[in-house]
Amino acid sequence: MPSAPRKQSKTYKVPRRPFESARLDAELKLAGEYGLRNKHEIWRVALTLSKIRRAARELLTLDEKDPKRLFEGNAIIRRLVRLGILDETRMKLDYVLALRIEDFLERRLQTQVFKLGLAKSIHHARVLIFQRHIRVGKQIVNVPSFVVRLDTQKHIDFALSSPYGGGRPGRCKRKRLRSQEGGEGEEAEEE
Protein backbone atom coordinates (compact mmCIF):
# COMPACT_ATOMS: atom_id res chain seq x y z
CA MET A 1 0.00 0.00 0.00
CA PRO A 2 1.34 3.47 -0.78
CA SER A 3 2.56 5.53 2.16
CA ALA A 4 0.10 8.35 1.44
CA PRO A 5 -3.47 7.02 1.20
CA ARG A 6 -5.46 8.36 -1.69
CA LYS A 7 -9.13 9.21 -1.77
CA GLN A 8 -10.83 6.75 -4.07
CA SER A 9 -13.53 8.12 -6.35
CA LYS A 10 -15.87 6.54 -8.86
CA THR A 11 -14.61 6.41 -12.42
CA TYR A 12 -18.09 6.54 -13.94
CA LYS A 13 -21.39 8.28 -13.30
CA VAL A 14 -24.65 6.44 -13.82
CA PRO A 15 -27.36 8.23 -15.83
CA ARG A 16 -29.99 10.10 -13.85
CA ARG A 17 -32.85 8.36 -15.72
CA PRO A 18 -32.08 4.64 -16.06
CA PHE A 19 -34.67 3.78 -18.72
CA GLU A 20 -34.58 6.68 -21.15
CA SER A 21 -35.07 4.90 -24.48
CA ALA A 22 -33.21 7.41 -26.70
CA ARG A 23 -30.11 7.21 -24.49
CA LEU A 24 -30.32 3.42 -24.23
CA ASP A 25 -30.42 3.12 -28.03
CA ALA A 26 -27.51 5.53 -28.45
CA GLU A 27 -25.41 3.64 -25.87
CA LEU A 28 -26.18 0.29 -27.46
CA LYS A 29 -25.11 1.65 -30.85
CA LEU A 30 -21.85 2.96 -29.36
CA ALA A 31 -21.17 -0.32 -27.56
CA GLY A 32 -21.63 -2.26 -30.79
CA GLU A 33 -19.66 0.12 -32.99
CA TYR A 34 -16.64 0.31 -30.67
CA GLY A 35 -16.80 -3.26 -29.31
CA LEU A 36 -17.41 -2.28 -25.70
CA ARG A 37 -18.26 -4.92 -23.14
CA ASN A 38 -20.70 -2.93 -21.01
CA LYS A 39 -22.23 0.49 -20.42
CA HIS A 40 -19.70 1.29 -17.66
CA GLU A 41 -17.07 1.79 -20.37
CA ILE A 42 -19.29 4.41 -22.04
CA TRP A 43 -20.14 6.10 -18.74
CA ARG A 44 -16.45 6.25 -17.78
CA VAL A 45 -15.61 8.11 -21.00
CA ALA A 46 -18.68 10.33 -20.52
CA LEU A 47 -17.45 11.33 -17.04
CA THR A 48 -13.98 12.20 -18.39
CA LEU A 49 -15.56 14.26 -21.16
CA SER A 50 -17.89 16.07 -18.75
CA LYS A 51 -14.97 17.01 -16.46
CA ILE A 52 -13.01 18.43 -19.39
CA ARG A 53 -16.04 20.32 -20.72
CA ARG A 54 -16.85 21.68 -17.24
CA ALA A 55 -13.29 23.01 -16.90
CA ALA A 56 -13.51 24.59 -20.38
CA ARG A 57 -16.89 26.20 -19.54
CA GLU A 58 -15.48 27.71 -16.34
CA LEU A 59 -12.46 29.07 -18.22
CA LEU A 60 -14.68 30.59 -20.92
CA THR A 61 -16.47 32.68 -18.27
CA LEU A 62 -13.16 34.43 -17.48
CA ASP A 63 -11.75 37.35 -19.45
CA GLU A 64 -9.80 36.43 -22.61
CA LYS A 65 -6.56 37.98 -21.30
CA ASP A 66 -6.89 36.39 -17.85
CA PRO A 67 -3.63 34.52 -17.07
CA LYS A 68 -5.54 31.61 -15.47
CA ARG A 69 -7.65 31.18 -18.61
CA LEU A 70 -4.60 31.35 -20.88
CA PHE A 71 -2.50 28.93 -18.81
CA GLU A 72 -5.15 26.32 -17.94
CA GLY A 73 -6.88 26.61 -21.32
CA ASN A 74 -3.63 25.95 -23.17
CA ALA A 75 -2.92 23.00 -20.86
CA ILE A 76 -6.30 21.39 -21.64
CA ILE A 77 -5.96 22.00 -25.38
CA ARG A 78 -2.35 20.74 -25.48
CA ARG A 79 -3.33 17.55 -23.66
CA LEU A 80 -6.26 16.87 -26.00
CA VAL A 81 -4.12 17.52 -29.10
CA ARG A 82 -1.37 15.21 -27.81
CA LEU A 83 -3.96 12.45 -27.31
CA GLY A 84 -5.34 13.06 -30.80
CA ILE A 85 -8.81 13.91 -29.53
CA LEU A 86 -8.67 17.52 -30.70
CA ASP A 87 -7.41 18.46 -34.16
CA GLU A 88 -4.47 20.89 -34.40
CA THR A 89 -6.56 23.21 -36.61
CA ARG A 90 -9.18 23.56 -33.84
CA MET A 91 -7.07 24.68 -30.87
CA LYS A 92 -9.69 26.85 -29.10
CA LEU A 93 -11.73 26.30 -25.94
CA ASP A 94 -14.96 26.61 -27.96
CA TYR A 95 -14.03 23.44 -29.83
CA VAL A 96 -13.43 21.62 -26.53
CA LEU A 97 -17.13 22.13 -25.74
CA ALA A 98 -18.04 20.53 -29.07
CA LEU A 99 -16.23 17.24 -28.28
CA ARG A 100 -18.28 14.04 -28.29
CA ILE A 101 -17.89 10.63 -26.65
CA GLU A 102 -16.99 9.17 -30.06
CA ASP A 103 -13.88 11.38 -30.23
CA PHE A 104 -12.56 9.68 -27.08
CA LEU A 105 -13.61 6.17 -28.14
CA GLU A 106 -11.72 6.61 -31.43
CA ARG A 107 -8.44 6.94 -29.51
CA ARG A 108 -8.78 3.63 -27.63
CA LEU A 109 -6.23 0.94 -28.45
CA GLN A 110 -9.02 -1.48 -29.40
CA THR A 111 -10.35 0.90 -32.07
CA GLN A 112 -6.86 1.74 -33.35
CA VAL A 113 -5.89 -1.94 -33.73
CA PHE A 114 -9.03 -2.54 -35.80
CA LYS A 115 -8.54 0.61 -37.90
CA LEU A 116 -4.91 -0.37 -38.65
CA GLY A 117 -6.13 -3.71 -40.02
CA LEU A 118 -4.35 -5.87 -37.42
CA ALA A 119 -7.69 -7.46 -36.45
CA LYS A 120 -10.57 -8.84 -38.50
CA SER A 121 -13.24 -7.12 -36.38
CA ILE A 122 -13.49 -4.73 -33.45
CA HIS A 123 -14.23 -7.71 -31.18
CA HIS A 124 -11.21 -9.60 -32.54
CA ALA A 125 -9.10 -6.53 -31.71
CA ARG A 126 -10.25 -6.74 -28.08
CA VAL A 127 -9.33 -10.43 -27.89
CA LEU A 128 -5.89 -9.83 -29.45
CA ILE A 129 -5.17 -7.11 -26.90
CA PHE A 130 -6.32 -9.22 -23.94
CA GLN A 131 -4.21 -12.17 -25.11
CA ARG A 132 -1.08 -9.95 -25.18
CA HIS A 133 -0.55 -10.03 -28.96
CA ILE A 134 -0.37 -6.23 -29.32
CA ARG A 135 2.44 -3.89 -28.34
CA VAL A 136 2.71 -0.12 -28.39
CA GLY A 137 6.35 0.69 -28.99
CA LYS A 138 8.29 -1.91 -26.99
CA GLN A 139 5.60 -2.33 -24.33
CA ILE A 140 2.99 -5.11 -24.54
CA VAL A 141 -0.40 -3.59 -23.65
CA ASN A 142 -3.31 -5.80 -22.61
CA VAL A 143 -5.82 -3.05 -21.78
CA PRO A 144 -8.33 -2.37 -24.61
CA SER A 145 -9.20 1.06 -23.18
CA PHE A 146 -5.56 2.24 -23.35
CA VAL A 147 -5.64 5.74 -24.86
CA VAL A 148 -3.22 5.94 -27.78
CA ARG A 149 -1.32 9.21 -28.20
CA LEU A 150 -0.66 10.65 -31.63
CA ASP A 151 3.09 10.05 -31.43
CA THR A 152 2.73 6.38 -30.39
CA GLN A 153 0.00 5.56 -32.91
CA LYS A 154 2.52 4.56 -35.59
CA HIS A 155 4.24 2.14 -33.16
CA ILE A 156 1.21 -0.16 -32.70
CA ASP A 157 2.21 -3.63 -33.88
CA PHE A 158 2.11 -7.32 -32.99
CA ALA A 159 4.28 -8.32 -30.03
CA LEU A 160 7.54 -10.11 -30.84
CA SER A 161 6.55 -13.01 -28.56
CA SER A 162 3.20 -13.39 -30.36
CA PRO A 163 2.71 -16.00 -33.12
CA TYR A 164 1.34 -13.15 -35.26
CA GLY A 165 4.56 -11.19 -34.80
CA GLY A 166 6.96 -13.98 -35.78
CA GLY A 167 7.22 -15.55 -32.32
CA ARG A 168 6.79 -19.17 -31.29
CA PRO A 169 3.76 -20.80 -32.97
CA GLY A 170 0.65 -21.39 -30.87
CA ARG A 171 -0.22 -24.62 -29.04
CA CYS A 172 -2.55 -26.02 -31.74
CA LYS A 173 -0.14 -25.21 -34.56
CA ARG A 174 2.76 -26.88 -32.71
CA LYS A 175 0.61 -29.97 -32.16
CA ARG A 176 -0.34 -30.04 -35.86
CA LEU A 177 3.30 -29.69 -36.92
CA ARG A 178 4.33 -32.50 -34.55
CA SER A 179 1.63 -34.82 -35.93
CA GLN A 180 2.68 -34.02 -39.52
CA GLU A 181 6.32 -34.81 -38.72
CA GLY A 182 5.21 -38.04 -37.02
CA GLY A 183 3.02 -38.97 -40.02
CA GLU A 184 5.88 -38.46 -42.48
CA GLY A 185 8.18 -40.62 -40.33
CA GLU A 186 5.67 -43.53 -40.33
CA GLU A 187 5.30 -43.41 -44.13
CA ALA A 188 9.07 -43.69 -44.57
CA GLU A 189 9.16 -46.77 -42.29
CA GLU A 190 6.41 -48.55 -44.30
CA GLU A 191 8.41 -48.29 -47.56
Swiss-Prot record:
Keywords: Cytoplasm, Phosphoprotein, Ribonucleoprotein, Ribosomal protein, RNA-binding, rRNA-binding. The keyword Transmembrane helix does not apply. One of its GO terms (molecular function) is rRNA binding. The modification Phosphoserine is found at residues 50, 161, 179. GO terms for biological process: cytoplasmic translation; ribosomal small subunit biogenesis. Component of the ribosome, a large ribonucleoprotein complex responsible for the synthesis of proteins in the cell. The small ribosomal subunit (SSU) binds messenger RNAs (mRNAs) and translates the encoded message by selecting cognate aminoacyl-transfer RNA (tRNA) molecules. The large subunit (LSU) contains the ribosomal catalytic site termed the peptidyl transferase center (PTC), which catalyzes the formation of peptide bonds, thereby polymerizing the amino acids delivered by tRNAs into a polypeptide chain. This is Small ribosomal subunit protein uS4A. It comes from Schizosaccharomyces pombe (strain 972 / ATCC 24843).
